[in-house]
Amino acid sequence: MMELSTRTLGDWLEHWALTTPDKEYIVYSDRNLRFTWKQFNERVDHMAKGLLAIGVKRGTHVGIWAGNVPDWLTFLYACAKIGAVAVTVNTNYKQAELEYLCQNSDMHTLCIVNGDRGNDDYVNMVYAMLPELKTSQRGYLKSKRFPCMKNVIYIGPEKYRGMYNTAEILLLGCNIDDDELLEAKAKVNCHDTVNMQYTSGTTGFPKGVMLTHYNISNNGFLTGEHMKFTSDDKLCVCVPLFHCFGVVLATMNCLTHGCTQVMVERFDPLLVLASVHKERCTALYGVPTMFIAELNHPMFDMFDMSSLRTGIMAAVSYTHLRAHET
């Protein structure tokens, strides 16, 4: 029987930063944004210090409400390194669903972007949920309805009243010395909760599922082993990171095998095809509707997909007939 790893997510990240520092880890092909393992690990450490500076610590719940933006993974690993719990928030949530999750999870810090349904959509929903935020000093939020909530972070350069932005979190991290970060890292155990994912709530209220470093890293590792992943692979990830498909089967697979994670911020069949073509991806994840959209795209024949050797098609079965037709 294969022995399971007891490394934490932070251990894995630092392992590859030491052994393959100059190899590309995170790539956004359309933005030409690229992080090597060393560069990404350093950014995560800076962000972890910033979170410590605003009171995030071991056991603190930090929500991430965003599409697949570049710093989504930064915040995930920053939480992991200091023992905090990343709470993944569905990007399709409406006001009531967001409020339920924030209350139920005892959320301390919420990281957001503008949103996908109009300018400042998420920002306005957060202000509606936390009316005290606009008049609060950053880091000192006192909400009657959400007593655990102390911080809101805007992922990006824009500034909103009562919220930190990414640059300010990184700047605050400069006040935390290396020893304090090392002390926080040393307390993290592989059996600590690192991620809380909420169920769909089909037959009742969604329930927060508490997942450990040991749980999700080994899940991703074994998935990759079945797919014969190595550090030479490049996985194109166009599925949402808030879902287990993105944050576990994709991200943890890449993390535990040292391979490159080619990110697509929001699903677009043309962008997926272009990313696979440009980066010579060897694996692609998606659901049947995504694969059908890619295969039926009028520009499909313009792209070279020959580098692909494996992938995962999830959700529902893709009939042999349809596969044969394409």
Regions inferred by a protein language model and the residue ranges of each:
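Adenylate-forming
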Residues: I112-K134, V239, E265-L270, C281-R322
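Structural core segment of the AMP-binding/adenylate-forming
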Residues: I54, I82-L171
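Conserved pre-ATP/AMP-binding loop-to-beta segment of ANL
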Residues: P21-E24, R145-M149, I153-Y160, Y164-Y198, ...
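Conserved AMP-binding/adenylation subdomain of ANL enzymes
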Residues: S217-K234, F242-A283, A293, H297-P298
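Conserved small/polar residues in nucleotide/adenosyl-binding loops
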Residues: T199, T319-T326
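Conserved AMP-binding A3 loop
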Residues: R34-K38, K185-K187, H191-N218
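Conserved AMP-binding/adenylate-forming core of the ANL superfamily
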Residues: Y25-Y77, K94-E99, Q103, N165-C174, ...
